[in-house]
């Protein structure tokens, strides 16, 4: 399941485009949360990679980058995207949402789809997630952070989906 998302698929690795600087935009409307403040050690301690999180105001998740969908989890609570420059992002909607087994989540993409910034990825029932999950805070991490030459966070507090630029990245050449 994690083979393509974490760069273990040799075919996908060899097809990576030449490195370029790219922007990661907010995938949700909400309040920016520092990754270290996410109430889950897997994300707060950057075990999955570095990034940011958003406390969402609504249940509409859009693509934070242009790229290819490399993973849509069966429970629809997480999506993996690979950018043309080779960065691999994981958007994990809420915390402990895997236990909801897809209830309240509607995916608008599938593996192999090409997306642009702002394209709909997943809609979810925010009230149901508040009720059934540990938290609505949604981490967005670059899972191949060790392959980046540039990772610069921009200052922001409130985010607008598909519009607020949050991170500049560039994969090493």
Swiss-Prot record:
Coiled coil location: none
Keyword Cytoplasm included in the entry's annotation: yes
Residues annotated as catalytic: 92
GO biological process assignments: phosphoenolpyruvate-dependent sugar phosphotransferase system
Principal cellular location given in the protein's record: cytoplasm
List of residues that carry Phosphohistidine: 92
Cofactor binding comment, as recorded: Binds 1 zinc ion per glycerol kinase EIIA-Glc dimer. The zinc ion is important for dimerization.
Domain of life: Bacteria
Domain PTS EIIA type-1 as annotated: residue spans: 40-144
Domain remark from Swiss-Prot or TrEMBL: The EIIA domain is phosphorylated by phospho-HPr on a histidyl residue. Then, it transfers the phosphoryl group to the EIIB domain.
Function: The phosphoenolpyruvate-dependent sugar phosphotransferase system (sugar PTS), a major carbohydrate active transport system, catalyzes the phosphorylation of incoming sugar substrates concomitantly with their translocation across the cell membrane. The enzyme II complex composed of PtsG and Crr is involved in glucose transport.
Protein's UniProt name: PTS system glucose-specific EIIA component
Organism from which the protein derives: Halalkalibacterium halodurans (strain ATCC BAA-125 / DSM 18197 / FERM 7344 / JCM 9153 / C-125) (Bacillus halodurans)
